[in-house]
Every structure is written in C-alpha cells, then in structure tokens.
Amino acid sequence: KEKYGINEENIQKARKIMTVRYEISRNGYSNIKPVIISKSISYLSANQIKEQSSSFPGTSVVTTPIVTYPYGSLASHILGYVGSISSEEYNANKEKYDINDIIGKTGIQYTLEEYLKGEDGIRQVDMSVDGTITEQHIAEEAEAGHTVTLTIDSNLQKVTEEALKKNIKDIANGSYGQKYNAKAGAAVVMDVKSGEILALASYPDYEPELFISGITQKKLEEYNKGNNYYNRAISGTYAPRFSI
C-alpha cells in the first residue's frame, strides 16, 4: 500500500487498486501509451465512465474487435488459441506489436501469425493537461490481416471428432469386449488424390475461447492434467496399425 500511495483501509478495495497500479507501472504507462485496465465491461459501466469523464481523468472507453470461436472446441488443435502478448514476446517484437496486443499462441493462429496480423493505423489524439482526451481523429487507417483458407471440411471435422470421442469412451467402457484404459486418441482424414487434410482430430480437446474470456484455475488444471493442448494427430508417436 505504501509503495503505491494507497490510503484505502478496506483490504479488498486496496488490493484492486494495487492490481491496477501494478499493471500501469509494469506496462510503462504514459499519455501516449495507454494501459488496458478492464475488458468486456457492460454498456452501463461504459456509459457511466463516458458521462463522468471529468471524474476519471486520463481514462477513456474504446471499442475493439474481439476473437470469437462460434463452433466452440471444434478444430481447436488446428486453429489454436490467442492470448495477451507476454513480456518476452513483446520485447522481442517491439517494432511490430503493442504491449496490449493479442497474438496467436498455438495452432494456425501461431504458425501464420505474421499473415493474420494486420497493420496498425495511426490515431491523432489531443489531450488536456490532466490527460483527458479532448479530441481525436484517424490519421491513417488500420489494415486487416490476410484471410487464410484451410482444406478442412468443417462438417467432416465435426463428424470425425464426435466419432473419435465416442470410440475412445466405448473402448474404455468395454463396448468392444475387453476394457482398456483409453483416454486419448487422434484421427486424420486425407484426400488420397490431392493429399489435402480434410479433417484432423485430437482428443481430449479444449475450448479456445476460454483463453480470451478468462479461464478458471479449475479448468486450467483440468486441461493441464489431461494434456488437452497436445495435438496427438501431428505430435504423437504411435505404433502403426491400419488405415482406411
């Protein structure tokens, strides 16, 4: 509390204030380099902050695009997930990224990050002496990243994942005779003429959107225990059996 000059007696409130001030100091806040202190706030909260801007000098509310996964865990190992750029990643790519950027962490979103990432625009901002934004306009428009098209058939991918999950559970339950300790597996569907991958499934999978909206400690431990991030279809080593 002394370090950040906090006089608040309520421990819970003091902790929240310290968290915000720590993030500000860690990210090197300045009038021209904002720090995100809250995401996905309600419309009510956003409007209250805007209407009472004089009470929150140096604070502004902005609308930003978000990454969504409309099909949930489908093709999670192929697509991968995105997350906030780490200090190490930022320091290695300061010329390309901002400390508040979201980048690909795994899968296609990591491998093709340089193609998927667009070009930042330039916004000219006028501020008052207390840091409050008084006027702003776009000096240079941002450019969207490239579109990446995969050979994956989404319907076939869904069927493949469902069949893989069912078969693993059936094997574990002894539906085919003897019970086995089956917990994981992989399946790949390839066009034998072109070599294109039409479906690629790995089980267990995960919900990539949780890494954006906020993953709980319980779910994180569950994923780590099951090694859910591991793409068994391309990284696993298995004795050959048969193919169809």
Language-model features: locations:
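Membrane-proximal periplasmic segments of bacterial cell-envelope enzymes
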Residues: 1-142, 165-186, 192
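A motif-centric feature for acidic-aromatic and gly/ser/thr-rich catalytic loops and repeats
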Residues: 205
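Residue-level detector of high-confidence beta-strand sites
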Residues: 81, 200-202
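Active-site loop and adjoining helix of the penicillin-binding protein/serine DD-peptidase-beta-lactamase fold
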Residues: 140-196, 200, 208-244
